[in-house]
Amino acid sequence: MSNADRSEDRAAIAARQWRSERPDLDSFPMEAVGRLLELAQLIVRDRLNPVFVRFGLQNGEFDVLATLRRSGPPYALTPTALYEATMISSGGMTARIDRLEKAGHVRRVKHPTDRRGTLVALSDEGKSLIDDALSIHVQTERTILAALSDDEQKTLDRLLAKLLARVEGE
């Protein structure tokens, strides 16, 4: 199914089959959402994960480092803030922080105002790593979107934001 000039993608084939088997069923929603799901899986698996692997990271670890980096100096957040910003489970977050700490990309430090708390801080090595990885990551995303004109990209972004707001609000 990697042929770029194929006339039908998997979602179109499934929708055509449903129209044949269940003509009473509106298959358009399955077709559109199916394309979104397949596209997301392909982007992560075939385009983004190879970037993460190149830098010795997993997807969730990249997210943690990127979240710390975009938080600005001193590039440190509580584990709870990281959990909320990345939508990773608290147990999953602990495992990621442990791996990143072991690799030297982050360190746990005492919270400056809460004696009971800790912060997860980006190390100099982690900052350098995420800066390098981000450059390749953004270029990869730019390449993906290059299939669309600038106006199409803006329209896609607006429509996806609208759908996301709707689904999050339900």
Region annotations inferred by a language model:
Residues 40, 130, 164-167:
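A structural signal for well-ordered alpha-helices, especially hydrophobic packing surfaces
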Residues 152-170:
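Exposed, interaction-prone assembly regions rather than primary DNA-binding/catalytic cores
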Residues 31-38, 63, 155-158:
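Amphipathic alpha-helical interaction segments
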Residues 27, 37, 41-89:
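N-terminal helix-turn-helix DNA-binding core of bacterial DNA-binding proteins
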Residues 96-158:
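Charged, amphipathic alpha-helical coiled-coil/dimerization segments
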Residues 1-55:
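N-terminal leader segment of winged-helix/HTH proteins
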